[in-house]
Amino acid sequence: MQGYGMPPHGGYGPVQFTPAHLPGGYVQPGYAQAGYGYAQPGYAQNPMAAYTWSNYGSNINLQQVDNDCTSLRAAMKGLGTDENTIINILTQRNNEQRYMMRQRYQALFQKDLVKELKSELHGHFEDAVVALLDSPYELDCKGLYHAMHRPGTDEEALIEILATRPSYQLAQDKLLFQHLYNKDLVSYVQSETSGHFRKILLALLQCQRHDFTYPINPQELQSEAHQLYRGGAARWGTDESVFTRIFATRSPAEIAYIAQCYQQIAGVDLYTTLKKEFSGNAEKALCGIFYASINPPEYFATRVRDAVQGIGTKDTNLIRVIVSRSDYDLGQIKQAYRKLYNRDMMADVQNDTSGDYKKVLTALLARC
């Protein structure tokens, strides 16, 4: 059985790639494409400026949103709570529509929708419902804080968030983290990590990684592959700074191209080199960046598996992955999960959850 960060069976496999095409398995809706985090001009001045309902106008049916708000209000009025109505509405809307509900609910009833729901719900069901109403930035920040604020750091959650978000989203996350927790995210990560692992995460937080629009430059990327070879397999010891710089600045498509060049130069795949040259959390971080670049659905499938296997459930991680991917590639993640583990992802999630919490996650998984 494969654990976290492992490549697909048989290695990450040959990626048929030419400069005119992105590598197979890379371009997944929402992963590195524009719009994943709904970034809007003006966010740098106000961490929540991106989420004013007027920004969305043309893609939103305001009457439908208002109807949803009225139904949610009715589900929470009087004795008892109509959990099924809450689940049905929130799981059948996308993140943009749900965030609009927060705006319109306040306008219609002068009440904070999230606070209203938190007062009616409890446990992991509450956590999942609130996550559905979070912006991508809020979901990231809560995940990062949860990974660090308790004794024992969840390094793999840090890797998942920092290694798979485009730079513009990490830049917004840094601003919102300060706004929510009155802490500097970079300083907090620095205080909770160490060694080369810390250097990799801090490099990612510099937000210099190229996005999906960055053009492929074959000559430049071949040079990068040579530098990786000279910094690792071709020498005694490892030049960690070369690996950190390349993996923290190159886009997933560029990393896929570099991997092919590296295979031709070194006669061994890049993933094997990472496993050989690094260890511990630094190895996990670089392998995580690599795997998420080559095949995002399989990478996120390993994160779901990590959350549900063994004793106990990593509920915060499970909720974040399912909610954050539900508008994009959750169906592909389910397929990848079956390919990797010969198991049904929905069944495994259902076996590890219960009650209304189970219903929420099941509804999201059934949508795709």
Which residues does each predicted region cover?
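Structural signature for extended repeat/solenoid scaffolds and their inter-repeat hinge/linker regions
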Residues: 2-368
